[in-house]
Swiss-Prot record:
GO molecular function: glycine hydroxymethyltransferase activity; pyridoxal phosphate binding
PANTHER family found in the cross-reference section: SERINE HYDROXYMETHYLTRANSFERASE, SERINE HYDROXYMETHYLTRANSFERASE, MITOCHONDRIAL
Name this protein carries in UniProt: Putative serine hydroxymethyltransferase, mitochondrial
Keywords annotated in UniProt: Mitochondrion, One-carbon metabolism, Pyridoxal phosphate, Transferase, Transit peptide
EC number: 2.1.2.1
Gene responsible for this protein: cbs-2
Note: In eukaryotes there are two forms of the enzymes: a cytosolic one and a mitochondrial one.
Length: 546
């Protein structure tokens, strides 16, 4: 196209844009760009705009194409990824999600996560950034901090909070690094007894978590007879070990934690009490179960589990007087500066501003009566689930062994060893019938690869509307899946022996290979059909068709 033809086309497009009131035409990227160029040409002719400010027509066309690409929605821009996401949305809708660490966040949180807040770099903290243009980023982060303190009923004179940590495990590392030197001592609940990797897990032969490489770690454990934390043994170990930090928190412990008892132990050994409430923060925010703030020095939490926010984290730290020493002098906390410095610049660069904005939205929602009612239902559902699974068969139960005998929070831990099956095999059968759960170690387990337990929880499906009656039905589905797993495990072993492969008969891989995708097993096919037709009728926050 000649320069004359190009100019004529531009002017014609501009005239059409000026002569019509059609919203669609006025919204046309090409016409708006053409009108803008005509206006700039007129201004340049009048000497109002320097020549260097205007765009050449060739570069304008290239830029228009780029803007068209940038303005395209996902379905147009990347159909392959769009298809994957749509399939995942369908899976979430058709699955019963029993994973205690998962939830369905709100549409408002998703809106904030997909907002232009993600475009901004903002190393530093509000009022002290290393980049310009952070006026509204600062406002967002300050709002998030204020809401975090409000949500948990904390006095800003006594508590501060950092909302920049990217997730829970890094947040824990940032606290350890702020308060300890390398090879200082840390105690946390042992992973096979319900703890978390980030509390310093190691085996006798390998340091699994790098935290156990950076610091010296010693686990405390449950009383295996009761399934409760053995606080007396913990105290004995702490007095001998003299840790710098004791972590109060878990990923698979269904009972209340005695924070007051842990405070006493920490005071005896001059240790910080750090509470990791990642799993229960939503319940604590709603005040349906006791929180750690009365007794802890530091509290960490993720924001996407029971709190039902985006995938982020918060670190709460004490301010003011820590204690009075033997001389009668007040000793102040020195946590805020070291922890903030550990987050940035110690471990992170720029924070994820879209996540912080989304977290602020979730915290606002966590202050509502609807959220408190939701958390009360989470507890009621967990109690009903544990009762149906754990009560004897002659008392309308299914007779399973529940670790600790029940639950005080959102999760239930089943010991499957009495059924002669492990969590790995049952998890796979559940997945094939449309139930997401996870294998988990239980006290007495020797291997984390074939743990004897199954961890299940109620937050996600309570979000979708499940009640106690629904979770009683969920228990029955789990029971049917366990029965299927036991049957298939027996058949897989017999098949391996028949083929002369006795050594492989007990391997999980042998079971998985024999099971396949379950399409040839009538019981699996039938149960999957029942689950999909039932759970698909419950809404998902992002699914307008629900």
């Amino acid at each position: 196209m000649s320069s004359f033809q190009s100019t004529a086309a531009v002017r014609a497009c501009a005239r059409r844009a000026a002569s019509t009131t059609s919203a669609a035409t006025l919204a046309s990227t090409t016409c708006r760009a053409a009108a803008s160029r005509i206006q700039l040409q007129g201004q340049r002719s009048a000497g109002l705009v320097p020549k260097s400010w205007t765009r050449f027509s060739s570069s304008s066309i290239a830029n228009d194409n780029q803007q068209k690409m940038l303005a395209s929605h996902l379905q147009t821009a990347d159909p392959v990824m769009y298809d994957i996401i749509e399939k995942e949305k369908q899976r979430q809708k058709q699955f019963i999600n029993l994973i205690p660490s998962e939830n369905f966040t709100s549409q408002a949180v998703l809106d904030a996560l997909g907002s232009p807040m993600q475009n901004k770099y903002s190393e530093g903290y509000p009022g002290a950034r290393y980049y310009g243009g952070n006026e509204f980023i600062d406002a967002s982060e300050r709002l998030c901090q204020d809401r975090a303190l409000e949500t948990f009923g904390l006095d800003p004179k006594e508590w501060g909070v950092n909302v920049q940590a990217l997730s829970g495990a890094p947040a824990n590392l940032y606290v350890y690094s702020a308060l300890m030197d390398t090879h200082d001592r840390l105690m946390g609940l042992d992973l096979p007894h319900g703890g978390h990797l980030s509390h310093g897990y190691q085996t006798p032969t390998k340091k699994i978590s790098f935290i156990s490489k950076y610091f010296e770690t010693l686990p405390y454990r449950l009383d295996e007879k009761t399934g409760y934390i053995d606080y007396n043994k913990l105290e004995e170990l702490a007095i001998t070990y003299r840790p710098k930090i004791i972590v109060a928190g878990a990923s698979a412990y269904s009972r209340l934690i005695d924070y007051a008892r842990l405070r006493e132990i920490c005071d005896k050994v001059n240790a910080y009490l750090m509470a990791d409430m990642a799993h229960i923060s939503g319940l604590v925010a709603a005040k349906v179960m006791p929180g750690p703030f009365t007794h802890a020095d530091i509290v960490t939490t993720t924001s996407h589990k029971s709190l039902r926010g985006p995938r982020g984290a918060m670190i709460f730290f004490r301010r003011g007087v820590r204690r009075t020493n033997k001389k009668g002098e007040e000793e102040l906390y020195n946590l805020e500066t070291p922890i903030n410095a550990s987050v940035f610049p110690g471990h992170q660069g720029g924070p994820h501003n879209h996540t912080i904005a989304a977290l602020a939205v979730a915290l606002k929602q966590a202050q509502t009566p609807e959220f408190r009612a939701y958390q009360s239902q989470v507890l009621a559902n967990a109690t009903a689930l544990a009762a149906r699974l754990g009560e004897p068969k002659d008392k309308n139960g299914l007779g399973y062994t529940i670790v600790s005998g029940g639950t005080d929070n959102h999760l239930v831990l089943i010991d499957l060893k009495p059924q002669g099956i492990d969590g790995s095999r049952v998890e796979r059968v559940l997945e094939l019938v449309g139930v997401a759960a996870n294998k988990n170690t239980v006290p007495g387990d020797k291997s984390a690869l074939t743990p004897g337990g199954l961890r299940i929880g109620t937050p996600a499906m309570t979000t979708r509307g499940f009640t106690e009656e629904d979770f009683a039905r969920v228990a029955d589905i789990i029971d049917r899946a366990v029965t299927i797993a036991v049957r298939i495990n027996k058949a897989a072993k017999e098949d391996a022996v028949k083929k002369g492969n006795e050594k492989a008969a007990n391997r999980v891989k042998t079971f998985m290979d024999y099971l396949g995708n379950g399409e040839t097993d009538p019981e699996i096919v039938q149960l999957r059909s029942e689950v999909e037709s039932w759970v698909g009728t419950y809404p998902c926050p992002w699914d307008q068709s629900s």
